[in-house]
């Protein structure tokens, strides 16, 4: 019994040591720009950009094959941060090809839903709830607006709608000083 425990411990220790040496010996250094781009991307690996996950999109952006506006869930803020890293001319806060848009979420018309589970399988954040051959619905707080479910729906029961304003998603405008308010009134 003790021999078995000692042999298993020695085997585990030896293989662990071998894996540690192999990891250091065969380590491949990735370019720093690739790690920086991947750090800015949301990391949901939804595939809405057409690349296999956020790492694939980061590789394409670092090579110049993908635009900074390719990440739909990231939106304008991610595109601006990526434009600064990839050195795209942002034009004073404007990203080429990206319009100012409000965040959207998926909405399922329940009378058209057949319960085929295709949207359920495509959602990267598990925002769609429902069972097989039952009506599905979307949890708006979990939806990132990648629109992967819209493409997967065979009955076109899913549409993108503007994210409803709730206490969690609604923000006040930035307060203005008295001088800024006065300048706005004079200009009008």
Curated annotation (Swiss-Prot):
Annotated keywords: 4Fe-4S, Electron transport, Iron, Iron-sulfur, Membrane, Metal-binding, Nitrogen fixation, Repeat, Translocase, Transport
Cofactor binding annotation: Binds 3 [4Fe-4S] clusters.
Enzyme Commission code: 7.-.-.-
4Fe-4S domain span: 29-88
Cellular localisation: Cellular chromatophore membrane
Limits of the 4Fe-4S ferredoxin-type domain: 104-133, 134-163
Binding, [4Fe-4S] cluster 1: 46, 49, 54, 71
Protein name (database record): Ion-translocating oxidoreductase complex subunit B
CC per GO annotation: plasma membrane; plasma membrane-derived chromatophore membrane
Region of interest called Hydrophobic, as start-end residue ranges on this chain: 1-23
Organism superkingdom: Bacteria
Cofactor(s) in the UniProt record: [4Fe-4S] cluster
An example Gene Ontology molecular-function term: 4 iron, 4 sulfur cluster binding
Major place of residence: membrane
Topology relative to the membrane: Peripheral membrane protein
Subunit structure of this chain's protein: The complex is composed of six subunits: RnfA, RnfB, RnfC, RnfD, RnfE and RnfG.
